[in-house]
């Protein structure tokens, strides 16, 4: 039997920081990224300069329209992401301009590693989004190479691109700094990141650590250690959110194949599962475990359902 193409739209899922989110995957078939971050939950892959497999814009638009038409609960944001880096998608501007007219008040969000913000074509597309969130895990070159394992190691060019974009962007610009114990949590690296972010037009810094199974062995920081790291960012709006289980709702009603596809993209917390899955979808977890299509992994004190 021929293998079906993976869906390009997934969710809704509960985002820790942006509410109820419907996700759009610009690279559903495989990971395509110019980084190979040690904390990536998508697995290891050789970083690339450009996308090798490009999905048609029309396919994405139709999938998004269909998903929105079939929603049973309101969402807060439409999140553009990828199995990799979404700004590698060559038709990003056409896509965002095509879908915005029928979103009816739903905010648009893109999750990027920030590495291509210096490109005019990328800047033009990003300006169309309500929220742009980029990662900045290191400025210290040694830490940058260790944590992000990039295709291009020109950190100065990346920083110049982020700074330039921040001057022309009118939406909400959010930085995420993900810290790994003993890798990029040094005082020197934190000082460099904080100093840079204080120079640009940024709405918030989301400071976090490992909370899901990752590609490489990547030790997480404790809550106390993360709190101490946040002190380097004095003067900035820093968010240190905890997973809010009480806010979760039963958002997902899906078949077993859809649930497997969802878990393949995003490991599901065992604590959240009964709260965001309806009873029928929740029962599918046991079936997937019994058939060895998913497994349970432990990260710190948390357990996650993960695809093999």
Regions of interest found by a model, annotated:
Residues 79-85, 113:
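Glycine-rich beta-strand-to-loop/alpha-helix junction loops that act as flexible
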Residues 43-79, 90-94:
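Conserved alpha-helical substructure of the radical SAM core
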Residues 27-29, 42-43, 137, 178, ...:
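Generic beta-structure capping elements
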Residues 19-21, 37, 75, 131, ...:
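Structural motif
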Residues 88-225:
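Conserved AdoMet/S-adenosylmethionine-binding subsite of the radical SAM
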């Amino acid at each position: 039997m021929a293998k079906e193409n993976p869906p390009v739209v997934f969710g809704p899922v509960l985002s820790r920081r942006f509410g109820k989110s419907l996700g759009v995957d610009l690279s559903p078939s495989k990971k395509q990224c110019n980084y190979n971050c040690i904390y990536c939950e998508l697995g290891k892959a050789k970083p690339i300069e450009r996308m090798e497999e490009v999905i048609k814009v029309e396919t994405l638009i139709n999938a998004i329209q269909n998903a929105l038409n079939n929603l049973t609960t309101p969402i807060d944001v439409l999140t553009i992401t990828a199995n990799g880096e979404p700004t590698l998608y060559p038709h990003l501007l056409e896509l965002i301009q095509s879908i915005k007219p029928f979103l009816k008040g739903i905010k648009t969000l893109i999750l990027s590693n920030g590495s291509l913000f210096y490109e005019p074509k990328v800047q033009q597309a990003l300006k169309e989004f309500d929220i742009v969130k980029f990662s900045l895990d290191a400025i210290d070159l040694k830490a940058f190479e260790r944590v992000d394992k990039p295709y291009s190691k020109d950190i100065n060019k990346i920083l110049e691109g982020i700074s330039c974009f921040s001057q022309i962007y009118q939406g909400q610009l959010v930085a995420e700094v993900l810290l790994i114990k003993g890798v990029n949590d040094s005082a020197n690296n934190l000082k460099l990141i904080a100093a840079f972010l204080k120079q640009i037009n940024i709405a918030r810094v989301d400071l976090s650590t490992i909370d899901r199974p990752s590609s490489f062995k990547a030790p997480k920081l404790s809550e106390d250690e993360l709190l101490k790291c946040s002190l380097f960012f004095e003067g900035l709006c820093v968010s240190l959110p905890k997973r809010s289980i009480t806010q979760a709702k039963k958002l997902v009603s899906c078949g077993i194949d859809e649930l497997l596809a969802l878990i393949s993209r995003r490991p599901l917390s065992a604590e959240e599962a009964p709260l965001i899955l309806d009873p029928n979808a929740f029962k599918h977890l046991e079936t997937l475990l019994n058939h060895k299509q998913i497994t349970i992994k432990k990260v710190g004190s948390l357990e996650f359902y993960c695809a093999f």
